[in-house]
Amino acid sequence: MDTSELEAAYRAILELATDPGPGPGPAADGDGEAWRAQDVLAHLVVNDRLLVRAVRSVLDGAARPYDNADAIELARLRELGERLGGTAGLIEALKGSSRELLELAGRLDQAQGDTPLPARIVDGDQTRVDQPLPLAGLLTIQARAHLPMHERQLGELLGRP
């Protein structure tokens, strides 16, 4: 499978995350239930792990469902951020998880990319997808919608819209 679009989306978000810029915006640290920059990075790491599991399952011939529920639980995201040592650790984890996803996705052939997976995607309290999607379609959503959305969000949190 061609991963150039996905790779470009990861490159953009990683460049933003690693650029020190003028300093964080007022919402970078957040409070309570508001997402912070670290929460966005942790979300992307967890989501990558879920996508890696889905891609690997197709490569192994036993397609498993994709559900992003674990990637949106704020307490879990904050615990991951603490465990990885904050922003720097999260950036390194995102580099690794995205590299693994890109490598595995690059091994998919057309038939594997067309494999339908039961998919559930929740955004806040809204269910956006709750139906089977071809694996390639799920990765296209990641490249064209999900990563760019979080790139904008991260830019705002870091004061770099």
Model-flagged regions — what are they?
Residues 1-8, 14-34:
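An N-terminal domain-cap segment
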Residues 3-6, 10, 87-94, 139-143, ...:
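Hydrophobic packing residues in well-ordered alpha-helices of helical domains and bundles
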Residues 10-21, 48-52, 56, 95-109, ...:
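Structural signal for well-ordered, non-membrane alpha-helices
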Residues 20-21, 36, 86, 109-110, ...:
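Helix N-cap and loop-to-helix transition residues
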Residues 22, 26, 64, 110-114:
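Secondary-structure boundary/capping residues
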Residues 27-74, 117-161:
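Short, contiguous alpha-helical
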Residues 76-118, 141:
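Acidic/histidine-rich alpha-helical segments that form the ligand environment
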